[in-house]
Amino acid sequence: MSSLISGISLRNRQLIAFGSLLLFSALTRFINLGRPAELVFDEVYYVDGARDFLAAGVELDNGAAEFIVHPPIGKWAIALGIQLFGDSPFGWRFSAALIGTISILLVFLIARKLFTSFFLSMTAASLMALDGLHLVMSRTALLDIFLSFFILLAFYLVLQDRYWAAAIVMGLALGTKWSAIYVLAALGLYLLIRDRKFFMTPIQFGVTPLLVYLFSWTGWFLSDDGWSRNHSSNALASLIHYHREMLNFHTSLTTDHSYQASAWNWLVLGRPTSFFYATPNNCGSDSCSQEVLALGTPFLWWAGLISLAITIGYFVYRREKSAGLILLFLLSSYLPWLAFPERTTFYFYAIAFQPFMVLSIVYVIAKALEDENKRKARRELAMVAIALIALCFAYFFPLYVGGVLNYDDWYARMWFTSWI
């Protein structure tokens, strides 16, 4: 076996290793994607919106009690899966699973650019693949996985100095969820200060994303049946009125929810979000539990909290560009939520900055490997840590994919009462 492996070139061994990881990522995201076979959590809103897009090109104002409070892009993405695979649980979630898998490839490419190391690139991609929150969001037809992907893609494009493309992608992020505006503002301000292009930068990261955002509303403009479309004879005035209503909804959302979680406890996994829970009778026990729990892999997230503090320290004392960019995207995706402690928020919103938490961990590993005398031992220690994270991921895996457990096994995974 060793002679067979030694006969394969280093490049081909690397391709096999990464291909295997990508295959693992795809399998964990696509196998049994139709489970649960019903709409879970906010899928009820977004799948319904996707159906409207396919039927009418716009989310319809049909007198229903619901109010549409997010832009169209993410729901168009969900609609693509339904168009390809039918109005079925697999179809609802296909696009999320595809984007989630591509995100792992993207993190690999980003780490390759930042750290110029195959080992560190594989570490970054592996940690993404082994995160429970990313897996759950990749298997659920919500908007946040698309938001996370667009922000991550913009980061990659900035690393490539492709600023126009990054601006367009940030427009797509904004057209998915408004929370992208914090990242857009932070990125634009950073580039304005760095490059001092006081005319071009505002056009790139002000006008361009706005035009992309407005373009995402094309179906609304072309229809007479969209929400608030007929508020005024002037379509733009109607859109502005509608956006005021949306803004009022977001700023006044304080309704209690059993799984709400303030932003301050996201990093410590204080209150994960249960998307689905049932008590089936097919686990060979008197009492069974089936759950889809949006919970980051605990060992990974707690390591991420420590790594974040270390990365901030490195940036403060060394002003390293890579640390600064990681922190720019991470903190602009996270810190604004701390300003709204009364608003109803959920832990799974953290998926927007989760990739940058992973990159923060890899950044700290990269710093640890700079000492050549200790590199071998520290690399082995990093591999042990990844193995422990993998075991932790495997332990919680049934909760991520809606697997059926007997009640005692399910309860054993509730490490804190706040997870129930």
Residue map of PLM features:
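Transmembrane-helix motifs of polytopic, lipid-linked glycan transferases
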Residues: 90, 94-115, 153, 310
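Aromatic-rich transmembrane-lumenal/periplasmic boundary elements in polytopic membrane proteins
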Residues: 35-56, 205, 209-269, 405-416
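Specific aromatic-rich, kink-prone transmembrane helix
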Residues: 106-109, 127, 146-170, 357-360
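Short acidic/glycine- and proline-prone juxtamembrane loop motifs at membrane-interface regions
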Residues: 39-40, 96, 133-144
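Extracytosolic helix-loop segments that constitute the early lumenal/periplasmic catalytic or substrate-binding loops
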Residues: 27-32, 44-76, 80-83, 244-247
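Transmembrane-helix signature of polytopic, membrane-embedded enzymes
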Residues: 20-21, 107-130, 163-165, 324
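Transmembrane helical bundles and short interhelical boundary loops of multi-pass, membrane-embedded
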Residues: 2-7, 200-201, 205, 209-213, ...
